[in-house]
Swiss-Prot record:
Protein name (database record): ATP synthase subunit beta, chloroplastic
PANTHER family named in the record: ATP SYNTHASE (PTHR15184), ATP SYNTHASE SUBUNIT BETA, MITOCHONDRIAL (PTHR15184:SF71)
Chain's role: Produces ATP from ADP in the presence of a proton gradient across the membrane. The catalytic sites are hosted primarily by the beta subunits.
Annotated GO CC locations: chloroplast thylakoid membrane; mitochondrion; proton-transporting ATP synthase complex
């Protein structure tokens, strides 16, 4: 894949090109611009409006060409607010699509859709930039080998493993631990895979973006003293931004991730929160451009827009981009065109459960609702597959028995069912795990558990080897050896109390 890197200064290119047009019409965030005959900009070219408003304040608005209308006019969508613009203002054709800074200089910083830093930490090195519109990697460049992306999180690796270079949907309401799970994944990919992460905040609340940034600084994911040692770059296009910015901010984040994959040859985690807002912004832009709406009022190009973004997220022979996308489901309707189109691209789903969070089991990943296309014997191996299936069967049986237990109590169950319940409760607790990024809040050190250790632990619980241990010993530990050590400590404590 050709990385089209430019090292030009935008001001120099303005002076060189001087392809000037004038604003002919403004409708909200959409501008019609007239250019001289034979000087029409290309689709997706960046246009810059510079001037002063009626109060003498400087205006600097970047737009993206979306349509060529004829009569030497183009229609462009603004990437920032259009207040203060008026007809007749000069518009400069930059001659290229939007380009954003890429590489190590982006780590630890917050950018907007244009690749401008918005964290008041000074300018960013823009000698290496890359256009946000690119083709997906060619078929011959793809790495077609199916391999698991080990996260070090037991419940994910065992029951709904992530595919290296795959796409994962993250489902969960407010307050069930999405942010902490995201931060732990960012931390683990940096430590175990030497990789980096890019976080794309697409159309979500500014407060949430700010909270995430503060928590990342607190947990060490962003290193304030030495930004180069940070593990993540942040790109935000929040709810208050115009639809053009919300529609393109995902591509800005993806472009930064592609550089780490293709040039630095690293494994990259790309977070998109929220993929539904990307579709929603596309729908708004589509209506503003006058396109005929499709089903439920969505844009007619919904599948194309989603495919263009998702096909660039993949493994190549150099590195991989594994994407975790938070999915908002409007009115809990999974048949809505936005989530339905997203599902077609997902390799795995991680569903967070409020019930588990209420029990204090973190990460609150629902072991029965979360799925993965990777959980097949030919991919993960017979041992992993069998262990995962047995764990699910045990938990499913426990779920079925809960009504009986609530009405009649445990004593009314058969001996076999009582054993199943005891093991299921141990499994449920063993699926919890202390996180590195939560150390500052909980005081207990984080644990990274390798896949082989995870499988060994659950096999031993299922075999009945630890039927005599108290279930509390399995709560918030790393591997199975820590659980046995905790059981010994609990036994000693109870003896001392006596």
């Amino acid at each position: 894949m050709r990385i089209n890197l430019t090292t030009s200064d935008p001001e120099v290119s303005i002076r060189e090109k001087k392809n000037l047009g004038r604003i002919a019409q403004i409708i909200g965030p959409v501008l019609d611009v007239a250019f001289p005959p034979g000087k029409m900009p290309n689709i997706y070219n960046a246009l810059v409006v510079k001037g002063r408003d009626t109060l003498g304040q400087e205006i600097n608005v970047t737009c993206e060409v979306q349509q060529l209308l004829g009569n030497n006019r183009v229609r462009a969508v603004a990437m920032s607010a259009t207040e203060g613009l008026k007809r007749g203002m000069d518009v400069v054709d930059m001659g290229n699509p939007l380009s954003v800074p890429v590489g190590g200089a982006t780590l630890g910083r917050i950018f907007n859709v244009l690749g401008e830093p918005v964290d008041n930490l000074g300018p960013v090195d823009t000698r290496t930039t890359s256009p946000i519109h690119k083709s997906a990697p060619a078929f011959i460049q793809l790495d077609t080998k199916l391999s698991i992306f080990e996260t070090g999180i037991k419940v994910v690796d065992l029951l709904a493993p992530y595919r290296r270079g795959g796409k994962i949907g993250l489902f969960g309401g407010a307050g069930v631990g999405k942010t902490v799970l995201i931060m732990e994944l960012i931390n683990n990919i940096a430590k175990a895979h030497g990789g980096v992460s890019v976080f794309g905040g697409v159309g979500e609340r500014t407060r949430e973006g700010n909270d995430l940034y503060m928590e990342m600084k607190e947990s060490g994911v962003i290193n304030e003293q030495n930004l180069a040692e940070s593990k993540v770059a942040l790109v935000y296009g929040q709810m208050n931004e115009p639809p053009g910015a919300r529609m393109r901010v995902g591509l800005t984040a993806l472009t930064m991730a592609e550089y780490f994959r293709d040039v630095n040859e690293q494994d990259v985690l790309l977070f998109i929160d929220n993929i539904f807002r990307f579709v929603q912004a596309g729908s708004e832009v589509s209506a503003l451009l006058g396109r005929m709406p499709s089903a439920v009022g969505y844009q007619p190009t919904l599948s194309t827009e989603m495919g263009t973004l998702q096909e660039r997220i993949t493994s190549t022979k150099k590195g991989s981009i594994t994407s975790i996308q938070a999915v908002y489901v409007p009115a809990d309707d999974l048949t809505d065109p936005a989530p339905a189109t997203t599902f077609a691209h997902l390799d795995a789903t991680t569903v967070l459960s409020r019930g588990l969070a209420a029990k204090g089991i973190y990460p609150a990943v629902d072991p029965l609702d979360s799925t993965s296309t990777m959980l097949q014997p030919r991919i993960v191996g017979e041992e992993h597959y069998e262990t995962a299936q047995q764990v699910k069967q045990t938990l499913q049986r426990y779920k079925e028995l809960q009504d009986i237990i609530a009405i009649l109590g445990l004593d009314e169950l058969s001996e076999e069912d009582r054993l199943t319940v005891a093991r299921a409760r141990k499994i449920e607790r063993f699926l919890s795990q202390p996180f590195f990024v939560a150390e500052v809040f909980t005081g207990s050190p984080g644990k990274y558990v390798g896949l082989a250790e995870t499988i060994r632990g659950f096999k031993l619980i299922l075999s009945g080897e630890f039927d005599s241990l108290p279930e509390q010993a399995f709560y918030l530990v790393g591997n199975i050896d820590e659980a046995t050590a905790k059981a010994t400590n609990l036994e000693m404590e109870s003896k001392l109390k006596k």
